[in-house]
Amino acid sequence: MPGGRRGPSRQQLSRSALPSLQTLVGGGCGNGTGLRNRNGSAIGLPVPPITALITPGPVRHCQIPDLPVDGSLLFEFLFFIYLLVALFIQYINIYKTVWWYPYNHPASCTSLNFHLIDYHLAAFITVMLARRLVWALISEATKAGASSMIHYMVLISARLVLLTLCGWVLCWTLVNLFRSHSVLNLLFLGYPFGVYVPLCCFHQDSRAHLLLTDFPYAVQHQAVEESASTVGGLARSKDFLSLLLESLKEQFNNATPIPTHSCPLSPDLIRNEVECLKADFNHRIKEVLFNSLFSAYYVAFLPLCFVKSTQYYDMRWSCEHLIMVWINAFVMLTTQLLPSKYCDLLHKSAAHLGKWQKLEHGSYSNAPQHIWSENTIWPQGVLVRHSRCLYRAVGPYNVAVPSDVSHARFYFLFHRPLRLLNLLILIEGSVVFYQLYSLLRSEKWNHTLSMALILFCNYYVLFKLLRDRIVLGRAYSYPLNSYELKAN
């Protein structure tokens, strides 16, 4: 009727009175969102949070077989043999002769100039390279235990004799080197220890790698927080000498325990576990870097520092040998300190952590957005705001801090369980192919001998890497519901 009151149209009812599905899924009083009408005023309807509407699925982990890993004593013995072979090859590269020439030419009758070799330096290098093997022998003997008093006295006597012998050889070689060389050359003998002090002594957060996973939820949460605060307090209160002694003790201690994973339910526990694993991983990488550089320094670089100025040698080939020794030592130590079980542990923790992708301003303006909460487990595809930036959840299970770069880096490195193993295979395979190419093109006898000897050592390392890659590749490629799953 003209002049009568008109009711709201169907289009107005659909716009103002009914909440949209996006608002129901993305809204929440705690997240700072709510229902709004056409004019922009808020409607006081309670909206459930996103965790009540969308529950992330459980994180499922693959079961991997227990691959054989070399024991501490066996690995140190093989590593020591490899370093001795590399040291022998470097001495061949430096002191080789042309022994096949006729006698009417000024040549040597031996393959090496043995009279130019400093045997005190060779003995010093051998003892320094054997330090881990000696400590592994002492550790294994200590773990065996003593069944009687006589057995205990024999173990103590053997340890004292072994350590005394090593110390006497070091002192004897240092005294003779001090008599025949300048002080500048002697400084090269202890240079790696000067690098180790700032590299490892002032980073005591690695003590947090002992994860407390055998306790209930409340006890575990309290224990992790107390251990983190205790670690920080100890690192601040200890003096330089204590830090140095602890770092040197860890340098000789080969048996580093592998942490465990407990599939925690709380976001705080997940982040604390990631922090502990991150500190433990950084500690292991530092040990790998230092020991590989230490080995390459004493095997391939230190003999060059004590060569006489009148001695000619192939500088390019010696430097190439130095690089090869460092790469091979790095791969061998990484394989031992980061085994497949440890990489699977990091992968499981990264699956619980998740990742956030930073988006540009203005994008997804019509999509529901939430305020990030540290006590919420966010599902995949959710948009949150944190520190005035917009982020999107990438993983199916996300508890990471969006602005924390270390969390994103941890997820990138370990969310694929075979990434580290593939990288090691790529490095070692490239070295093997390059050495085969150099072996085919080599014309000098010392080049052929050095490549042939080093290749035998590299074949063993490459075989172990390829074996682990094939077995783990098949284990991770199986569908998750084809065997027993572990879900939190």
Curated annotation (Swiss-Prot):
Residues carrying a glycan: N31, N39
Keywords: Autophagy, Endoplasmic reticulum, Glycoprotein, Membrane, Transmembrane, Transmembrane helix
Topology in the lipid bilayer: Multi-pass membrane protein
Domain of life from the UniProt record: Eukaryota
Cellular-component GO terms for this entry: endoplasmic reticulum membrane
Compartments it resides in: Endoplasmic reticulum membrane
Record InterPro entries: Uncharacterised_TMEM39 (IPR019397)
GO BP annotation list: autophagy; negative regulation of autophagosome assembly; negative regulation of autophagosome maturation
Residues passing through the membrane, by range: 72-92, 110-130, 154-174, 182-202, 287-307, 319-339, 420-440, 446-466
Record-linked PANTHER family: FI21814P1, TRANSMEMBRANE PROTEIN 39A
Complexes and interactors: Interacts with SACM1L, SEC23A and SEC24A.
Function: Regulates autophagy by controlling the spatial distribution and levels of the intracellular phosphatidylinositol 4-phosphate (PtdIns(4)P) pools. Modulates (PtdIns(4)P) levels by regulating the ER-to-Golgi trafficking of the phosphatidylinositide phosphatase SACM1L.
Family: Belongs to the TMEM39 family.
UniProt name for this protein: Transmembrane protein 39A
